[in-house]
Regions:
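Short, aromatic/basic amphipathic alpha-helical patches
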Residues: 106-116, 225-230
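Active-site neighborhood of phospho(di)ester-bond hydrolases with catalytic His/Asp-centered motifs
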Residues: 49-53, 69-77, 97-99, 157-163, ...
C-alpha cells in the first residue's frame, strides 16, 4: 500500500489569494504550496482517492494522471468533495463510498454525473482492492464527519480528516498500533478553533496514540513551514 499526500492545506490553500503573510509570501517566492487536503491510496495497481478537493485536476496531473478506481468522501465541506466534477469527460466516473449523510448530501450536487454510490456505516469495515477500510466518527461541528482507517497485511494507517480534539472514545480505540497517523492541525498552538485541532492538540493526541509516525494535515496559511511533523504536498509512504 502506498499513500501520497496530494494536498495538505485547508479550504483556502497556501498561498491564500490576496495574502501577504510570511507563509504566503514564502510560498509565492519559492513555489511551495499547500493544495487542499486529499490523499491517494494505491494498492494492487488500483487507486483510491480520499476526498476530491477543488485542486483535483492539478493534483492528479502532478502525480502522473492516475486512473481513479474509487473515491471516499469524509464529509460534506466544499474543500473535501467539490472537485469530483473534474472527472467529467476525463475518465469513467468512479464509484463513491461514504457514510449515508455524507453521501446523500454530496452526491446531490452531482446529479449531472452517473456513478455508483456505496453507503458505508461508521465502524463497519469493508474491503476494497485488498485494503480493509473502516470509517470512524470524529468531531467537526456541525458537519457529520468521518476519519478513515486503512489496514493491509500488518500495516495500519489512519486519517482523521477535519476534527477537533474531542474524538469519540470508540474511534480512539481503533487508532492503536498505527504505522502512520495523518491528523488535523489547522492553526498554530496559540490559536483555538472549536471545530479543528491546533498544532499542539495534534501533537498531544499523537503522543497519546503513539503511532510510529504522524503528519499534520489540513494546515492553514497561519502554520509556519518549518514545524516538525508537518505533512507536505507530495509526501509518500509505503507499507506492506
Amino acid at each position: 500500500m502506498k499513500i501520497t499526500l496530494l494536498g495538505t492545506g485547508d479550504a483556502t490553500g497556501t498561498p491564500k489569494v490576496g495574502c501577504e503573510c510570511p507563509q504566503c509570501t514564502r510560498a509565492k517566492n519559492t513555489g511551495a504550496m499547500r493544495l487542499r487536503t486529499s490523499l491517494l491510496v494505491e494498492n494492487s495497481k488500483k487507486h483510491i482517492l480520499i476526498d476530491s478537493s477543488p485542486d483535483l485536476r492539478q493534483q492528479l496531473l502532478l502525480h502522473g494522471s492516475p486512473h481513479i478506481d474509487a473515491v471516499i468522501w469524509t464529509h460534506g465541506h466544499y474543500d473535501h468533495f467539490i472537485g469530483f466534477g473534474e472527472f467529467y469527460r476525463v475518465q469513467k466516473i468512479p464509484p463513491v463510498f461514504a457514510a449515508p449523510p455524507v453521501l446523500n448530501y454530496c452526491a446531490d450536487l452531482f446529479r449531472f454525473l452517473t456513478f455508483d454510490k456505496g453507503e458505508i456505516q461508521p465502524y463497519e469495515p469493508f474491503d476494497i482492492f485488498g485494503i480493509t477500510i473502516t470509517l470512524f466518527m470524529v468531531k467537526h461541528p456541525p458537519a457529520f464527519t468521518c476519519g478513515v482507517l486503512f489496514e493491509t497485511g500488518e500495516s495500519r494507517v489512519a486519517f482523521t480528516s477535519d476534527t477537533n480534539i474531542d474524538i469519540p472514545q470508540k474511534s480512539l480505540d481503533l487508532l492503536t498500533n498505527l504505522d502512520l497517523l495523518l491528523i488535523d492541525a489547522f492553526v498554530p498552538s496559540d490559536i483555538t478553533i472549536h471545530k479543528h485541532m491546533n498544532y499542539l492538540d495534534a501533537c498531544i493526541l499523537s503522543g497519546k496514540l503513539s503511532p510510529k509516525e504522524y503528519r499534520c494535515m489540513h494546515q492553514s496559511h497561519f502554520i509556519p513551514w518549518d514545524l516538525p511533523h508537518l505533512g507536505k504536498d507530495g509526501d509518500t509512504f509505503e507499507f506492506k
